[in-house]
Amino acid sequence: MLTTKSLVERFELEMIAGEAGLNKQIKNTDISRPGLEMAGYFSHYASDRIQLLGTTELSFYNLLPDEERKGRMRKLCRPETPAIIVTRDLEPPEELIEAAKEHETPLITSKIATTQLMSRLTTFLEHELARTTSLHGVLVDVYGVGVLITGDSGIGKSETALELIKRGHRLVADDNVEIREISKDELIGRAPKLIEHLLEIRGLGIINVMTLFGAGSILTEKRLRLNIHLENWHKEKLYDRVGLNEETLRILDTEITKKTIPVRPGRNVAVIIEVAAMNYRLNIMGINTAEEFNDRLNAEILRNGNNGNNGEEK
């Protein structure tokens, strides 16, 4: 649960009034600058949002007649309002301080400029209030691509991750991956605090990757881009040998590219994952080897077909 108190501590803000409301829960990622409300229009006032007051809002407020000021601020401070933040180290109006105390609305000041603070708060709130889920798998950063390795228990996910780490790649999470959907089509994965930096190898036990391989072998969090699903090789199953079949894995409301890799003795899965990551990077740059091969093949078939027709005409 995200509260106003945690926001104050995170951004080192200064409390002015309304300390009794510090445990209010923040539920909305949106932030408002109540310009219309300062003018007296409260019909669509989003009172459940954090309110930012900067130079523009307070300059207009100072132009209001004395008899309107107190009522305006009492309407601004609602029981459901998580916080009102005055930026640029400006002096909060006395009427606002009184209203904040009356309605137990946290009144906070910040030295940061309004636009800059809004940007930082939005990023923070989207991250903290994002939808979350957990998946069984291993998350590794391979050539800058967040690769989620999944498969049945005992298939060799952790062993593959260990080989990737030895080859210079970085571990994010093993066994349990916490995933946040911080925005549309953007998933961020990390390890639970309890198992951070740890890797379980059957027959060996739990190892601390950072202790063994150094700080450069681990990463706190990584954006998920590619899913490598490991499964035992089935003779009767037809596997994609060209790369034209597009599979996806849906996590929350976001889909990421999925590649199914059959596992059997003699296959170096770590190298295959490295190549898959590099090939994914080429694909997002607009280079698709499978499609280029398919185009060349179709052109060759068409050319041979035309040559055959010309021979028949002769």
UniProtKB/Swiss-Prot annotation:
Residues that span the membrane, as ranges: none
Pfam families per UniProt: Hpr_kinase_C, Hpr_kinase_N
Disulfide bonds: none
GO molecular function, one term: protein serine/threonine/tyrosine kinase activity
Enzyme class of the recorded protein, top EC level: transferase
Signal sequence bounds: none
Keyword tags: ATP-binding, Carbohydrate metabolism, Kinase, Magnesium, Metal-binding, Multifunctional enzyme, Nucleotide-binding, Serine/threonine-protein kinase, Transferase
Coiled coil: none
GO annotation terms (biological process): regulation of carbohydrate metabolic process
CDD domains tied to this protein: HprK_C
Subunit structure: Homohexamer, arranged as bilayered trimers.
Protein name per its UniProtKB record: HPr kinase/phosphorylase
Lineage per the UniProt record: Bacteria, Bacillati, Bacillota, Bacilli, Bacillales
